[in-house]
Amino acid sequence: MSLSPVVVIGTGLAGLAAANELVNKYNIPVTILEKASSIGGNSIKASSGINGACTETQRHFHIEDSPRLFEDDTIKSAKGKGVQELMAKLANDSPLAIEWLKNEFDLKLDLLAQLGGHSVARTHRSSGKLPPGFEIVSALSNNLKKLAETKPELVKINLDSKVVDIHEKDGSISAVVYEDKNGEKHMVSANDVVFCSGGFGFSKEMLKEYAPELVNLPTTNGQQTTGDGQRLLQKLGADLIDMDQIQVHPTGFIDPNDRSSSWKFLAAESLRGLGGILLNPITGRRFVNELTTRDVVTAAIQKVCPQEDNRALLVMGEKMYTDLKNNLDFYMFKKLVQKLTLSQVVSEYNLPITVAQLCEELQTYSSFTTKADPLGRTVILNEFGSDVTPETVVFIGEVTPVVHFTMGGARINVKAQVIGKNDERLLKGLYAAGEVSGGVHGANRLGGSSLLECVVFGRTAAESIANDRK
């Protein structure tokens, strides 16, 4: 049995999951190539959590869920796009993914939120100070860093290493070529390669090609997210699927000190899932079910809010501070969120309604815990209370739609093998996981499913490699 190192391209959660599973479970050595100067990709910034259906945490909170219900929610969100068998695998493997993170890396994942498009609360995060993406990525990367020091024959991590070519021979992977920060090229022999190189949300060139209407929108993506993996896989003959399906997240924070910046901090969906509402600056009123799917919330902001900057107001009650203290403290430190009384809100944001009318708007929303919301929101948490006054304190920030996630990419099968245009496995030893792949989310990704996709298909790639090597 060959034990040549598996080359893992990228150190977001998909790459970290694949690498950890390869070395910890199968004792297969890995060489990890990361084009950036640090580990984590976009995964390290994930702020809402990771989905799982039928988990121990859900049982603790008496939440009834099933992989089938999760799959149905995913299919509904996908709007006829994508590959249903990949969606089924995502849902069916979700409790195993949560269990793996808890058991292997001692993560608590003991809190839940219900995000847009989900039938129940299934997005997991841990109590404590760390955001979910940072916590999960840190745990997995720390394990690999330790192994790189203590067992260098098992784990090698190369940063500032951009993959520029893949060599094949007789229908199999044979080598990977990468370029270091000095521009020098190096070749690594490899029988197996796992592409975990992320999406293309930072690439104006690729956005112009696949979704030109989005080129001028700001993005939450890191500057490494330029679609290198998709281009290399396309060159090898991979079937690219749903490349025009690009998720615009409805809420990226507008920095009042740099309003026109093309990069935005994400205003996590959990801010709405745990109680935040959206107000239209033109009317001072709610205008959308904040927990419908991301594409619908985005369309509503773009349709009714100020056209010049697509701006909405994210308003959160004081009760939310208990659940999201660390998030809100960070956002306030960055001047993205303010803590104001309602009197101050009307003045500060020049709302066209009186303070009394704003109080009435928030109190009416709070009453939907006992009656139906005309806008259709069914999860009313951490509302503003039954006695809203001009001195009621809220947390508020300005938000705008942002390019966030590319659903399209190289088509894979349920074994995480890259598929060619003839519907067959493209090359022996070629795998993909995470945002570089396509078909898992269709036209719209559910919040909490990106981290899940990384764990499910990263681990699957490792399992497939191990099975091929038997």
Curated annotation (Swiss-Prot):
Q: Does the keyword DNA-binding apply?
A: no
What's the EC number here?
Answer: 1.3.1.6
Q: Residue positions of the PTM Phosphoserine?
A: S66
**Keyword Phosphoprotein set for record:** yes
Where does this polypeptide localize?
Cytoplasm
Q: Which GO terms describe its cellular component?
A: cytoplasm; cytosol; mitochondrion; plasma membrane
- Modification(s) after translation: The N-terminus is blocked.
The entry's free-text remark on the cofactor is: Binds 1 FAD per monomer.
Q: Which UniProt keywords apply?
A: Cytoplasm, FAD, Flavoprotein, NAD, Oxidoreductase, Phosphoprotein
Please give the cofactor(s) recorded in the UniProt entry for this protein: FAD
User: What is its EC class?
Assistant: oxidoreductase
- What reaction is this protein's catalytic activity? succinate + NAD(+) = fumarate + NADH + H(+)
Q: What GO terms in the biological process aspect are recorded for it?
A: cellular response to anoxia
UniProt similarity note: Belongs to the FAD-dependent oxidoreductase 2 family. FRD/SDH subfamily.
Q: Sorted alphabetically, which PANTHER family does this protein's record hold? A: FAD-DEPENDENT OXIDOREDUCTASE 2 FAD BINDING DOMAIN-CONTAINING PROTEIN, FUMARATE REDUCTASE
Biological role stated in the UniProt entry: Irreversibly catalyzes the reduction of fumarate to succinate. Together with the second isozyme of soluble fumarate reductase (OSM1), essential for anaerobic growth. Involved in maintaining redox balance. Reduction of fumarate is the main source of succinate during fermentation, and under anaerobic conditions, the formation of succinate is strictly required for the reoxidation of FADH(2).
Please share what else the UniProt entry notes about this protein: Present with 7620 molecules/cell in log phase SD medium.
Q: What is the official name of this protein in its record? A: Fumarate reductase 1
Origin organism of this chain? Answer: Saccharomyces cerevisiae (strain ATCC 204508 / S288c)
